[in-house]
């Protein structure tokens, strides 16, 4: 079944591959901003260095703009890939329905076929978009947050690491 669905991605493979890249960039920018804020407080405010505050503030604005751009582009390409995937899937279903014999047409109701081509495909489309966006965003967020925690304070981050491993084990047993 997955092979059948994967065939419908066709010309949307590039959009499907670009979406996670933009999501990774967006998450990286989201994780850099608190680190820059810490630098402003630790090195700028406490020392009274206005040049440092201004410079790091400019980097924060740049990181926010890059993160916003990456988020918008990730959303755009994710939507393009998922809607194109759904369109191809509906087209393939329609072509398959056209080959039905009269006995098959009598077996499936028109309402059932319409539901399959609309609601079910829309659900698959939404699942594909969530796969493109969230299945990459969550692990990358975890990795970037862990990295930032170790950059700030490795001793405290080790507690975070133990908690993440514990939660991972619990989640595996729940599933």
Predicted segments with their positions:
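A short amphipathic helical element positioned immediately N-terminal to and/or at the very start
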Residues: 1-16, 113-117
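Hydrophobic alpha-helix/TM-entry signal in multi-pass membrane transporters
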Residues: 4, 15-20, 56-60, 108, ...
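Transmembrane helix-loop-helix hairpins at lipid-water interfaces of multipass membrane proteins
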Residues: 10, 16-73, 77, 150-155
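Alpha-helical transmembrane segments of multi-pass membrane proteins
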Residues: 15-16, 63-82, 133-140, 161-175
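Hydrophobic alpha-helical transmembrane segments of ABC transporter permease domains
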Residues: 21, 25, 29, 33, ...
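Alpha-helical transmembrane segments of polytopic integral membrane proteins
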Residues: 34-38, 75, 90-94, 111, ...
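Short helix-capping/hinge motifs at transmembrane helix termini and TM-loop junctions
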Residues: 46-47, 75, 82, 101, ...
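Short intracellular "coupling" helices and adjacent cytoplasmic loop segments at the cytosolic face
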Residues: 47, 83, 91-115, 119-121
């Amino acid at each position: 079944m997955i092979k059948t669905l994967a065939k419908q991605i066709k010309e949307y493979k590039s959009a499907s591959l670009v979406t996670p890249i933009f999501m990774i960039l967006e998450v990286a920018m989201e994780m850099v901003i608190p680190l820059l804020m810490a630098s402003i407080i630790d090195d700028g405010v406490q020392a009274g260095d206005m040049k440092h505050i201004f410079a790091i503030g400019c980097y924060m604005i740049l990181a926010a703009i890059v993160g916003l751009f990456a988020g918008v582009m990730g959303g755009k390409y994710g939507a393009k890939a998922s809607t194109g995937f759904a369109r191809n899937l509906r087209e393939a279903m329609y072509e398959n329905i056209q080959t039905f014999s009269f006995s098959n047409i009598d077996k499936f109701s028109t309402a059932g076929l319409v539901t399959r081509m609309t609601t079910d495909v829309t659900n698959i489309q939404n699942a594909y978009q969530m796969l493109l966006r969230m299945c990459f965003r969550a692990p990358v967020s975890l990795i970037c947050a862990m990295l930032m925690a170790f950059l700030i304070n490795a001793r405290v981050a080790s507690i975070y690491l133990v908690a993440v491993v514990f939660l991972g084990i619990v989640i595996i047993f729940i599933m």
